[in-house]
């Protein structure tokens, strides 16, 4: 061994002590100490703390460190979590009520649910680098259209309850009789669905009438009806005549339908329904103690422009080939704001993809066989119980029977408990039992033994089971497109999944510098527990003694989030940031009502706010009043004072984002809060930019009363290509009593206040990700993450500001965790639009930053703390090379219309075509930077034509000829 190596080895040995080596913050935060020093030098600063002192106003800084547990190591945290998981008891749950155990095909679990190539992508705003996901979502829409028998479907909603509430709002929006204010809900709907619908109705002044669909006297005061199919107690009812009755009085009919049942039973469309809603959970998604699961929403073509949620449509690209895209975006909150069809942005893309793949893997025959097997097991069970003297209350059923157990009910439940089986318990002594895909002969024998029935020849009975009665039987075909006929072996399925994955750019490819989106690392260790059965196989309505592990996670996470936000209480129920906004505003509304100030209905919102803000305010029943911004991007204090004073008697709230959507820490934020409070209002803080606050300041310190957090931004839940998300809210002490409750579960605030999500704790299984993240980082790690997010953003701003002016800075010349680059001058000087730069970045291997928000013609960049200096430099180099291309257009070196920017992105097919008629070389199109020779991401399509797609709307799979 030479002396140099000996000295190096000795030095390394001296450094290694007893401390654990698998610490996490150094894995999560991109820049190392040397890189940090280089970045600070570029900024002319001597330390990160000096940067923070200049960027973050001293008046809002926390006086002490966060009181959180010491950071754990990756190995240790998984050991600890296994111990917590063991406190959950995994019973066989036959509770039903819209939630079912299912078998998740391994090829789908491993290659989608557990694959960062799928779960780290962003919402497919940039269509050219999202074609894989878009195709999977188009498959989902086609699946929903076929099974429901309706004409158009969106690409998922948050859950069944939310979808039903959205259906009510659509019916209300399109009603022809402006005086109609009543909405009928069948008492046979799932209780949690009714709960969410009633919550949504109250602020809008809608009167929900719950009752028997057979006896209700509909009249022109009703604008809509909601039915459950099959009913929550298992009854299968043909609603055709009732739907006709509703149409006779001008009411829109919605059917909440079980997708698997629709493979055997008459579809909602066949019954004349206008809307079908539901959940795709039993198509390959774990129970997860309530979520996440993909809700669905299908309707008639005439209502397409009033639909909520994302809609995938077929268009064409620059080469005339088919290209998929988000369609009819003018319906959505980021454009229509308080006039939007819904406040929902992030939905459940990853879960919708999984459900569509489940349908593809099994195909129509496979799904029908699964449904038939469940129906046969249920029929045998019902027949044997009847023969034993038990009364079954529903004559026709699919998978659920309700049993009148009488005096034996407690004995039966005790025997079920001894076999680790859950049933649904009704208050009137009935028992509900719902069978599912996982049930086998041994399970059925156990069920019969619970009812003291033994020695039954089940296999013989299986042969003799009658089919679904003709009057209920489905007569129409479904899933006829070749995609549902072609991938039934694991090899073919694996290759199809991989093919689609290769068409999408995710964090496995490069940084995704989307402003206000916080596309940070979603670490593998954080993701591990999501698919553990101790968490994944728990029914949301399982008894509390079976969910002690979840209780520990919820209590600890709520405590940690209270510490981070400076608030007194947290609700984890909202299953998206949009729902967090809605829940927070409802808490404010209820607070004012409790003080006999229900007349407070004005919500002040800065003009720069996220589009969800005004959309959520409208949902919560508030009147939106817009507040101006000054030339520096801050809230205009004089305008705020004037409008707060003008509405002093009816001011309910101000919604504000901090740091602002302009990427700066406003110096006057505490004064802003004081102005609103002095006029009787509450301050709602949008937590979209919380990644710049953690450990440095907090909503509570600033003076806010409520704030939603995006766990899928700040706290590492992956975006999933457009969901799932989690949007918990933190509130000050006086608002704690007004947090959302749930009709089926008593939580910390009771259940007097209605639910905003179908499940009591929303998307419970993925809050584990945020729990692990906080436990791994600890107080110091979280604060350093915040510091580095601010450092990275300022480094990019500094490197690019000479050629791309940074539109807004704080008073000391620094930005927060994101910056806005002004590209507007290039439109005049070179005819180059911001979209041209965004699409050209694809050729360099990058997802574009946020385009034209909050200022048209700009790019908003948020690099997050997870990106290394090498990646930041690569992005900056791409932007600088693009600037040179713009100069080449300006000085005539490149043509004004035929140039790499206008023709971007360039596909492999384009640059290898026999014909190349462009005025620049192929190599400049394909390899504009040296690093691309080492690794190149190729877009699958050229630039997609948005206008063509909306004018020629197609939202289901194209015929097979289009693929030839």
Curated annotation (Swiss-Prot):
Its job: The glycine cleavage system catalyzes the degradation of glycine. The P protein binds the alpha-amino group of glycine through its pyridoxal phosphate cofactor; CO(2) is released and the remaining methylamine moiety is then transferred to the lipoamide cofactor of the H protein.
InterPro entries: GcvP, GDC-P_C, GDC-P_N, GDC_P, PyrdxlP-dep_Trfase, PyrdxlP-dep_Trfase_major, PyrdxlP-dep_Trfase_small
Subunit-level organization: The glycine cleavage system is composed of four proteins: P, T, L and H.
Residues where N6-(pyridoxal phosphate)lysine is found: 713
Cofactor: pyridoxal 5'-phosphate
Protein name, UniProt field: Glycine dehydrogenase (decarboxylating)
EC number: 1.4.4.2
Keyword Transport in annotation: no
Gene: gcvP
GO molecular function: glycine binding; glycine dehydrogenase (decarboxylating) activity; pyridoxal phosphate binding
Biased composition (Polar residues): 1-11
UniProt-annotated stretches for the region Disordered: 1-21
Family: Belongs to the GcvP family.
Protein species of origin: Leptospira interrogans serogroup Icterohaemorrhagiae serovar Lai (strain 56601)
Pfam families registered for this protein in UniProt: GcvP2_C, GDC-P
GO cellular component terms listed in the entry, alphabetical order: cytosol; glycine cleavage complex
UniProt keyword terms in alphabetical order: Oxidoreductase, Pyridoxal phosphate
Catalytic activity: N(6)-[(R)-lipoyl]-L-lysyl-[glycine-cleavage complex H protein] + glycine + H(+) = N(6)-[(R)-S(8)-aminomethyldihydrolipoyl]-L-lysyl-[glycine-cleavage complex H protein] + CO2
GO BP: glycine decarboxylation via glycine cleavage system
